[in-house]
From Swiss-Prot:
Entry function: Modulates RecA activity.
Classification via InterPro entries: RecX_HTH_1st, RecX_HTH_2nd, RecX_HTH_3rd, Regulatory_RecX, WH-like_DNA-bd_sf
Protein localization: Cytoplasm
Gene: recX
UniProt entry keywords in alphabetical sequence: Cytoplasm
Record-linked PANTHER family: REGULATORY PROTEIN RECX FAMILY PROTEIN (PTHR33602:SF1)
Pfam families in the record: RecX_HTH1 (PF21982), RecX_HTH2 (PF02631), RecX_HTH3 (PF21981)
Family to which this protein belongs: Belongs to the RecX family.
Predominant localisation class: cytoplasm
UniProt keyword Cytoplasm present: yes
GO biological process entries: regulation of DNA repair
Entry GO CC: cytoplasm
UniProt-recorded name of the protein: Regulatory protein RecX
Length: 212
């Protein structure tokens, strides 16, 4: 047990305070916690209460860090967890912060996948999109659901437009039709389109049957 002898607002951050017990600096925390916990000068505090305050303060810092992160750019749960881990927060604290954001729909992998797919379909095929979302930690169930909604005809039309633009650039530099076809095919594959789609488009643009 000890007696709180001083509570001082920090000079560099007015939202945080330094708490002194028996004239010695003991801990710093968010000013909000002082009011929530009913802490005031001359009150008595024990070690367990201090530990609880420090733990809650860590959660507030983690939560605020998470909020700042998603304000800058939308994240998947895995991406946010990795960011918070890099900053040194404990797993239990990170879990609480993530649950807080999910409660207010500020973290939603399903919504993220929808937005990501809609944006990337303008320049990528479903295979590249799929593997990118896997790396971002989106679950298989969400992936299967969202990728199944992609309109194959629209995807193929986009692939053709990209290939046509690339073809017009390549044909100025490559006179060998076979090599040109190979380069165009690899270009489409790198964009995430499947074999049949790539083959069909290359044949349409070059009249080259080598893929068959």
């Amino acid at each position: 047990m000890g007696k709180i002898t001083s509570i001082e607002v920090q000079k560099r951050n007015v939202n945080r305070v330094n708490v002194y017990v028996d004239e010695a600096f003991t801990f710093a925390c968010d000013a909000e916690l002082i009011y929530k916990q009913g802490i005031q000068k001359d009150s008595v505090i024990d070690v367990e209460a201090i530990k609880e305050i420090v733990k809650e303060d860590e959660f507030i810092k983690c939560k605020n860090s998470a909020l700042r992160t998603v304000e800058k750019t939308y994240k998947t749960e895995k991406e946010l967890r990795d960011k918070l881990t890099e900053k040194g927060f404990e797993e239990d604290t990170i879990k609480r912060a993530i649950e807080f954001l999910k409660e207010y729909n500020l973290l939603n992998d399903e919504k993220y996948a929808e937005m990501y797919i809609k944006d990337r379909l303008r320049s990528q095929g479903r295979n590249k999109i799929k593997y990118a979302l896997i790396r971002k930690g989106v679950s298989e169930d969400i992936l299967l659901d969202k990728l199944s909604n992609i309109d194959t005809e629209d995807e193929n039309d986009t692939a053709f437009k990209l290939a046509e633009k690339k073809y017009n650039i390549l044909k100025k530099k490559e006179s060998d039709k076979y090599k040109l076809s190979q380069k165009l095919f690899r270009f489409l594959l790198s964009k995430g389109y499947d074999y049949d789609c790539c083959n069909s488009i290359v044949r349409r643009l070059t009249n080259n049957e080598y893929m068959e």
